[in-house]
A protein has these predicted regions:
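Glycan-recognition and catalytic cores of secretory/periplasmic carbohydrate-active enzymes
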Residues: 1-212
Length: 212
């Protein structure tokens, strides 16, 4: 897939971003699963999934941020949302194909995501530890949707527990009635407001996405 297109649909850059590659695999899989059983949609989904399976990670399902056209890694797997979109892609693709390998990739990647919740960037975290430790809204926001996306691969009890945790984080930690009902993007590790740039940040798109 190429995702860097101008207004006429012409490719202006051939680098490949795992966020967008994963979204396209998910999209073609979802269209096949829920709209119409069109073979060309399934073929597109499988083609993208096979590219990601071969080139998108380091061999241990640590998903790179970007690749060149041929699949050589450009940016290391520092970004946890590469993992989330890979999980969504292979979860939906497993439904479309019945392929157990795709299901296993989705489950393994989801497990890695959960192991990284306390430090999503891992060894690529550039922040100095201990000075201003913050909890970010983006991960619990997307985990709720992610768990529903791979519901067919999760134990029902585990799914319910994950959903309850995410809803608590969204509604009891980041949603702030005392600020007029806005959702802040960052709080401290105890859930308190922080008077700094990051603590004052609001991302309306994330709030809408979480409520959806």
């Amino acid at each position: 897939y190429f995702s860097c297109l101008d207004r006429e649909g012409k490719v202006f850059d051939t680098d490949k971003f795992i966020w967008l590659q994963g979204r396209e695999v998910w999209m073609f899989s979802m269209l096949y699963n829920k709209v119409e059983k069109r073979q060309e949609w399934l073929d597109c989904a499988v083609q993208g999934g096979e590219f990601l399976k071969k080139y998108g990670h380091d061999g241990n399902y640590n998903w790179y941020f970007s690749l060149d056209r041929s699949g050589r890694p450009l940016v290391e797997p520092y970004n946890i949302f590469s993992y989330t979109f890979a999980t969504m892609a292979f979860g939906q693709l497993s439904l479309a194909t019945g392929n157990q390998e795709y299901a296993d990739i989705a489950k393994k990647t989801f497990e890695i995501i959960l192991s990284k919740v306390s430090n999503p960037k891992g060894k690529w975290n550039k922040l100095h530890p201990g000075t201003r430790n913050l909890k970010n809204f983006a991960l619990p926001m997307i985990l709720c949707n992610l768990a529903l996306e791979i519901e067919h691969l999760l134990d029902p009890g585990y799914l319910e527990q994950t959903m309850e945790t995410c809803i608590h984080e969204v509604m009891d930690v980041f949603y702030r009635p005392e600020l007029g009902g806005i959702i802040v993007e960052n709080v401290d590790m105890d859930g308190n407001l922080v008077d700094c740039f990051e603590g004052r940040q609001v991302t309306p798109g994330h709030a809408i996405e979480a409520m959806w």
